[in-house]
Amino acid sequence: SGQMYEPEDSGKVMWYREDTKGQILEEGINEAGSMSEWVSAATAYSNYNVNMVPFYIYYSMFGFQRVGDLCWLAGDIQAKGFLIGGTAGRTTLNGEGLQHQDGHSLILANTIPNCLSYDPTYAYEMAVIVHEGMRRMYENQEGVFYYITAMNENYTHPAMPEGSEEGIIKGLYKLKSGGKHKVKAQLIGSGTILREVEAAAEMLEKDWNVSANVWSATSVNELVREGMDVDRYNRLHPTAEKKRSYISQCMDEQDGVVVASTDYMRLYAEQLRPWIKQRYVVLGTDGFGRSDTRERLRSFFEVDRYHVVVATLSALADEGTIKYDVVAKAIKQYKIDADATNPVKV
C-alpha cells in the first residue's frame, strides 16, 4: 500500500519516500528470492500483458556473483528491467574486506548477450542511461535488460556537456579537453575512478606540462560489443567500404598515449585494446578486497590520481616523448613505494 506514515527526515531535501502508486519489496539478505521477484516483475509483460519496470538495488558484489544463474535465466526468457549494483567497485564498499568488494560484476555482466551494462559517474549519465533503457525496453519492446552500477560518495555533479547523450549511450564521450602543452595524453575513466582521472589530468597539466583529455567510459562492454560487430562486418564484407568502430572514431585522431583506469579488474578495460592504435595502458583493481578507507584502497590497488599520473608519464617515456627521469621524479614526489608487493599477490 506504500508509505502510510511521515518519516523523520520529511523536512529534508533528500527524504525517504515510498509512492503509494509503486511497490517496494525489502527482502533483506535474500539474494535468490529478491532476484526471483525481479524476474517475475520483469517478465510480467509476457506472462500477464502488463508492462512493469522493476529496479532491483543491491550491493554490486551480491548480484552476478551470488545469483549468476538467475541472471542468465533472465536473459534467456527476455526479462526487462534494471539491475542496480550499489556501492560498486573494488575500493568503494570499503569497510568489509574481500567478501563485499566488487571488481568483476561488469565482466560477469558481459557474459549475458542481452544484458547492457554501464558504469556511470554523474547523475546526468545515470539519467540518460535509464531514459534510453526505458525507450528500448518499453517503447521499442526490445528483449534486453540493464545492469547499472551506482556509488554513494559525496561529490559535485556537473551539468551535462552539450551533445554528450549519444556518447553516454554508446559508452564513451569526451568529458574535458586538455590544455595547450605540446605533450598530449588521453585519460579514460569510469565510475568512481573517473574523478581520480579528472584530478590526474589537472596534475599532469600543472606539474608535468602534459595536456590530457578526459574521457568518461560509461560502458566498456558496449564499446567492445560494437567493436566486435564492426570487425565481423568487415571480415564478411571484404570488398565493401570498411567500417570503423566507435571507439576507434573517438581515439584515432587523438594525440598521445591512452591510459584507462577503473575500479574493476584490468581485464575489463583491456577489452578495448584491439581498437586503440596508440600506446595503451590499463590500471585496475586485480586482487582481493581490503578493509581500509577508500583513499588508501585506491592507493593500494594503484588506481588513484597519483598512479594515473605515473602511468601516463611512464607510457610517454616508453614511446620516447619524455625522459624516464621524469617518471622517477614523479614516483619520488608522490611517495609511491616502487617495491611494494603487487596487490594481486597479497
Predicted regions and their residues:
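Thiamine diphosphate
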Residues: S1-T111, E125-H131, E198, A269-E270, ...
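Short catalytic-loop micro-motif centered on adjacent basic/acidic residues
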Residues: L25-E26, F55-I57, L116-D119, L187-I188
